[in-house]
Regions:
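A short aromatic-anchored loop/beta-hairpin motif
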Residues: 1-124, 129-186
Length: 186
């Protein structure tokens, strides 16, 4: 079985609809299937707005970046997923992806946003992408996705519209050079 957990999936140009030009960070990959977050489709909702909509008592000492909440995928689109670096504090519903990367789905992490208890680096997504057992491997075999090692720089520092070309660059690919015909297939 491929080890895809903690890797990027990069959509091939022929992939259309929801996943066109997307980069997905794979949070979980096992015999039951796979789950990941699209990291380059921002919504128009900022993390600060999300925080206030969740009715937390806004504290004056909180400072928020103007980062946007991501559209993480078409599944559970009303549910929040926070991808973050290891934090000093443990959160109620956290899943270890790698030694340094975690996925948290409990509201206790949101309560830390803008404070010193927050993870140093994090992104917030509504919804996720999921695949049944063997489905993702088949899509990769069918050339729907490229697999690349994940990059913290792309995850947390690269602006949204540059994440797709930056992920392709990890593999030495310029997405503008893709040939759209399937060479060798008749």
């Amino acid at each position: 079985m491929m080890d895809l957990q903690g890797q990027f999936l990069i959509a091939m140009p022929q992939l259309e609809d929801y996943f066109q030009n997307t980069v997905v960070y794979i949070c979980e990959h096992n015999e039951q299937g796979s789950m990941g977050l699209v990291i380059n489709q921002p919504t128009d909702l900022s993390i600060a707005e999300l925080y206030s909509k969740m009715n937390f008592m806004m504290k004056n000492d909180r400072t928020f970046s103007n980062e946007l909440v991501l559209a993480g995928g078409p599944v559970h689109s009303e549910r929040g997923f926070i991808l973050h670096k290891k934090a000093a504090k443990e959160f109620e519903h956290s899943y270890k992806i790698t030694d340094e990367m975690f996925l948290t789905t409990s509201a206790d992490i949101v309560e830390t946003f803008g404070s010193e208890d927050a993870p140093e680096k994090y992104l917030v997504a509504l919804g996720c992408a999921s695949w049944t057992a063997g489905q993702l491997e088949q899509e990769i075999a069918d050339n729907a996705w490229l697999v690349a090692p994940a990059s913290d720089t792309i995850l947390f520092e690269t602006i949204y519209e540059d994440r797709y070309p930056a992920a392709n660059q990890l593999l030495g690919i310029n997405p503008h050079n893709f040939v759209f015909s399937q060479v060798g297939h008749s």
